């Protein structure tokens, strides 16, 4: 998963919902490790995803449990398409502008913890 921020190895849950005709919820539970652009494995992992100039983190999830449930309460929605706004904003900023934005906005989490985006967290 590419993050469009977290640090270290910690618990993570990813939830998938079916918004179509067949209801279903699937949850993946595990421990996640964050890979940043400064890490050796960044380039090889990034190749696994569509190009995204704004990609700042990849989460490597070691699965511990997979569960499904009925999803009967999940509403039905029709996807109209992706919004171009974020990609357009990132293209206009360019790599240097995005890095500056990350340094201003993404080095500390909402609860005041360092994200490790530019330097390793011990």
Predicted regions and their residues:
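Binding-site signature for planar aromatic cofactors or substrates
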Residues: 1-122
């Amino acid at each position: 998963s590419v993050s469009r921020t977290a640090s270290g190895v910690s618990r993570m849950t990813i939830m998938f919902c079916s918004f179509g005709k067949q209801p279903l919820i699937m949850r993946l539970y595990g421990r996640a490790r964050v890979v940043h652009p400064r890490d050796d494995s960044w380039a090889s992992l990034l190749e696994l995803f569509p190009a995204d100039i704004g990609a700042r983190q990849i989460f490597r999830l070691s699965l511990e449990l997979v569960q499904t449930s009925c999803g009967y309460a999940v509403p039905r929605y029709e996807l109209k398409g992706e919004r171009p706004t974020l990609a357009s904003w990132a293209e206009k900023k360019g790599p240097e502008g995005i890095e500056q934005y990350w340094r201003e906005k993404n080095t500390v989490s909402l609860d005041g913890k360092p994200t490790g985006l530019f330097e390793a967290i011990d």
